[in-house]
């Protein structure tokens, strides 16, 4: 907000997102070239994606993904939530991130959780821009120590490539350092918080009960 421009890459936007963000629906980014006319695109794309943007993304498809399951626009669909093919959707999201990173101009990449770490790593490799990942919890926390090796591998690869690792607590930071063998200098604890009250609200007398 303010002097920060944020591009928010969502797998499956609802159309109800905050307007101060630039929304990119990853399910509207083509990965397979399709010859689609302008009027048809206007009828198929949501308000937050223009035909011009679609064509621009189409020009930045970087590999042959014709073996992937795509729709009539050459885009991949996402189930949303935590489907049975979750790891496939994580991989698909990272493929699309490669197209987006080749098209967009930005200063820093933020990967919100382990599901988006592969996409963040891909965007960093494409752009050379720094990657900051957010760690709300690790698989050590979620599994009570019975770690899923696939999830651990995704988490660690994201951490290894990250320039900054934001942890929601000092406990999480220590887990990242000790269990994922990360450099303490790039791990910071940033607690979930709210904005402080403005002074005029702080000056309102408290009611004594």
Which role fits each region the language model picked out?
Residues 89-96, 129-132, 140-157, 196:
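Nucleotide-sugar donor phosphate/pyrophosphate-binding loop at the beta->alpha transition
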Residues 109-110, 160-170:
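A short beta-strand/loop micro-motif in the catalytic core of glycosyltransferases
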Residues 98-103, 125, 148-165:
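Membrane-proximal helix-turn-helix segments that form the acceptor-binding/catalytic region
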Residues 200-209:
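Nucleotide-sugar donor-binding and catalytic loop/hinge architecture
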Residues 5-101:
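A conserved catalytic-core segment of Leloir-type glycosyltransferases
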Residues 108-110, 117, 121-141:
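Active-site proximal beta-strand in glycosyltransferases
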Residues 11, 135-138, 191-192:
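Histidine-centered beta-alpha loop that forms part of the nucleotide-sugar donor binding/catalytic region
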Residues 171, 193:
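Carbohydrate-associated surface elements
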């Amino acid at each position: 907000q303010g002097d920060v421009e944020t591009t928010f890459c969502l797998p499956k936007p609802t159309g109800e997102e905050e307007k101060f963000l630039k929304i990119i629906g990853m399910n509207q980014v083509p990965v397979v070239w399709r010859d689609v006319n302008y009027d048809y695109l206007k009828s198929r794309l949501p308000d937050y994606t223009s035909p011009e943007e679609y064509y621009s993304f189409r020009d930045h498809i970087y590999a042959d993904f014709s073996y992937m399951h795509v729709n009539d626009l050459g885009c991949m669909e996402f189930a949303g939530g935590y489907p049975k093919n979750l790891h496939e959707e994580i991989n698909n999201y990272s493929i699309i991130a490669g197209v987006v990173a080749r098209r967009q101009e930005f200063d820093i990449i933020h990967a919100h959780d382990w599901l988006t770490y592969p996409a963040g790593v891909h965007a960093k490799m494409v752009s050379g821009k720094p990657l900051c990942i957010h760690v709300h919890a690790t698989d050590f926390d979620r599994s009570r120590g019975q770690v899923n090796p696939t999830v651990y591998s995704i988490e660690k690869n994201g951490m290894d490539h990250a320039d900054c690792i934001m942890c929601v607590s000092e406990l999480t930071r220590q887990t990242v350092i000790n269990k994922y063998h990360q450099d303490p200098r790039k791990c910071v604890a940033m607690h979930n918080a709210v904005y402080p009250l403005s002074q005029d609200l702080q000056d309102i007398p408290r009611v004594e009960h």
